[in-house]
Regions:
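N-terminal helix-loop segment corresponding to the beta1-alpha1 unit
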Residues: 1-203, 383
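Flexible, small-/acidic-enriched active-site or ligand-binding loops
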Residues: 290, 357-386
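Glycine-rich beta-alpha junction loops
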Residues: 40, 140-141, 214-219, 256, ...
Length: 386
């Protein structure tokens, strides 16, 4: 048996996270992915000191081959080969088009208009390879009033309203941490769209251009607040860890430094189970907590009382106890916890790969397990030009 995309060649000229990670997902499915980087201006995530190049090996951005040391770059570019070309030079552009002749898919994530300036837009690529599939994923898409805007994940999160939803009621958006959720969703959106285009080409022989707006790919993930606004006129506000409809619904401190467990109770049956798990304290039998409406209307006191109980427990002990009686609960894990987690280890999620410049590490691995199709070998990110 072969991996699903064995025999498919992808050229990746995307920058930062969404596009490169989407191309890596195609590599996870068995495609041969070739990352084309400009020289002498390599990818943002390779440049020491760049805002996008974070998490250096041994916390040293200026070690051997500093352009290979960024954690961001290494995560988003696994399972790829690489080549450096100066696309502003006629020879570099000619070489790129020769490479495109052998490819099935081209991925770019420039701001709208940049591919045209470089001469690698879809019409030019179609002349080179008539059945090529080209995916463009500027932040706001290739058409519309914002088509030329330059964007990064934080700006797209702001445009989508995600910043306004996260955080606590007494904090403004300036206190909201950056998560770049748009980038993660953009990567999966890209991979899905390319798979659909490959299926179409297999049926018809036709390539096509895919216009992906990262913002539009993200907005459905905010479906409830958006639809609540159009259906009920309610403007969403940040609520911390709370929910519009159920309580308790929060994150509670446990024993130990920076130790937490999240708990959700969405029915009277789960509330009864939580009460019994806590030892049925006298306060839990008070009338104000008898029903969902009462619990939802008294969340400040309820959360404080629950936290008095969780403070005496290890976070995983609290999780196992509550899960054992049917109450949704999860210990809040940090990176150290994740790499030591027995469930992820048993499923073989983390994959070990060695890189000549930074050494051998465990990487978050393939997102899928197929019953019939094998997974291709897992490789660390390519070195510059390798």
């Amino acid at each position: 048996m072969k991996p699903p995309l064995e025999g498919i060649t992808v050229i990746d000229v995307a920058e930062v996270w969404a596009g490169p990670m989407g191309a890596s997902l195609l590599g996870d499915l068995g495609a041969t992915v070739i990352k084309v980087e400009s020289f002498p201006r390599p990818a943002h995530t390779r440049r020491p000191g760049s805002a996008m190049a974070k998490g250096y090996t041994n916390n040293d951005p200026w070690g051997p081959r500093p352009w290979d040391r960024s954690a961001t770059h290494n995560m988003a570019n696994r399972n790829k080969y690489g080549v450096t070309l100066n696309l502003d030079h006629p020879t570099g552009l000619k070489t790129f088009k020769r490479l495109a002749e052998m490819a099935d898919v081209l991925v770019e994530a420039f701001s709208a208009g940049t591919a045209e300036k470089l001469g690698i837009h879809y019409e030019a690529m179609k002349e080179t390879k008539p059945d090529i599939i080209m995916a463009s994923m500027p932040g706001w898409g290739a058409q519309g009033p914002y088509q030329g805007y330059v964007s990064l994940g934080s700006g797209l999160d702001g445009f989508s309203g995600h910043y306004a939803l996260r955080g606590y009621p007494d904090n403004d958006p300036s206190m909201t941490p950056v998560v770049n959720h748009c980038d993660a969703i953009g990567a999966v959106t890209l991979a899905f769209a390319v798979l659909v285009a490959i299926h179409h080409r297999n049926r018809t022989g036709e390539g096509q251009w895919i216009d992906i707006s990262q913002v539009e790919g993200f907005l459905p993930h905010l479906g409830r607040p958006m639809m609540d606004y159009v259906m009920n006129g309610r403007k969403p506000v940040p609520m911390g860890n709370r929910d519009h409809h159920v309580a308790p619904h929060g994150c509670y401190r446990c024993r130990g430094e920076d130790s937490w467990v999240v708990i959700t109770v969405s029915s009277d049956q789960e509330w009864e189970a939580l009460r019994q798990a806590m030892g049925d304290p006298e306060w839990s039998r008070e009338a104000e907590f008898d029903c969902l409406l009462g619990r939802h209307g008294n969340q400040d006191r309820l959360d404080a009382l629950i936290q008095e109980w969780t403070r005496g427990l290890d976070k995983k002990e609290a999780m196992r106890l509550l899960q054992g009686v049917g109450v949704p609960a999860q210990a809040v894990l940090n990176d150290e916890d994740l790499y030591a987690d027995p469930h992820l280890e048993a499923r073989g999620f983390f994959q070990r790969a060695g890189h000549p410049s930074i050494g051998e590490y465990l990487y978050p691995g393939h997102l899928w397990k197929f019953g019939k199709s094998p997974r291709p070998p897992f490789r660390a990110a390519n070195g510059l030009g390798e």
